[in-house]
Amino acid sequence: MTATKTIEVALSTSGLGPDGRPIRIPLGAEGLTGAPPGLEPELEGEHMLINIGPQHPATHGVLRLVLELDGETVVRCIPHVGYLHCGFEKIGEYRQYNQIIPWTDREDYLNSMGNNVAFVLGAERLFGVEITERCRVLRVIAMELSRIISHLVWLGTTCIDIGAFTPFLWCFQERENVYKLLEGWTGARLTTSGTRVGGMIADVPDGWTDGLRAFLRGFPKTLDQVDAMLTRNAIWVGRTVGLGVMTPDEALNYGLSGPMLRASGVAYDVRKDFPYLGYETYDFDVPVGTNGDVYDRFLVRFEELRQSVRILEQALARLPDGPVNIDDPRLILPPKHKATSEMESMIHHFKLVMEGPRPPIGETYVPIESPKGEKGYYFVSDGTAKPVRWRIRPPSYVNLSAIPRMVEGHLLSDVIAINASIDIVMGEIDR
């Protein structure tokens, strides 16, 4: 990297220069030459430096890993992120609460409904409202379907990375079945924007639950097929056992969560330890590993797929009748037929859309158990319709921070499997 590139410049928002253009401020100190500290390591002896990414199929996004190698052994790893930065948190400060929901789709786009639910849980705590029982159960269904989607994509793409093709096809076929269910409910497959503060975008249509039951009858058979092909497969075991080991203490010290933490033997699950949406009333197990390696992360996520099926079956059995949205004119729009026929409802609709609901002054943090770990949203309200601060706690970002420790001492070919086992989405990391 040249000094010219290192001493890059940024556009300042502080003012304009004499020529009417934004003032440029150097990012580096005056006189700085070469790469900033830690960007490119000083090589020792005959060590070699290589890049994986930011454009590489096995990084599953614009992630760059700078690796220092001694032969084929990784001596050091420096992850580079930020290529996909969009400024979600800053944008949220200029949007009403319901207007922020579409941005949550685009963080971890494999868990869009889960992000939607997590966001409105935090907003509803800020507003001090209680949702209906039907909405509560539907949100559990939405979150577990998103967990299944995310784990299926992880499993299928990890199989591709390691060299197994058939399970990839099985996983993506089942993923397509779930997307059809979400599309029938929200009208969208990937970026659903399915929730609203105080409820959902819509109730499930007639016959939708029958489709979910049909999926739950067939999905376990696919899991059995994948289990038979992978779990005791000598090649799969040889490519995953003993790689990227994290002890329980290391996992906790790095702040890992989700399957990454549970694979190391720590039974922490937000659904059990800090229940929300009535998860404490559902009968399901939290799978825990013992070795903290790539193989245990596979086992934990695979078993979580079966546990999600259990939760969904229980949710369907207890899904009550009744409204999906709360009856609160501060938050919920009037019915469409009233908004187009009654002047009062039309005015109510206009003011709520244009001005937005206003929570009381305060702050709150709400975590959920996303497919990748503890996903949290922090809000600060000054009593206006837009949050003063909206902070995202992205599990992918925290989990990725441990990759230098996990790949150290392993072969270059093992880096791909270790990176895949973290299960990252760059939209969530860079935000």
What is each stretch, according to the model?
Residues 2-431:
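Metal/cofactor-centered catalytic core regions of large enzymes
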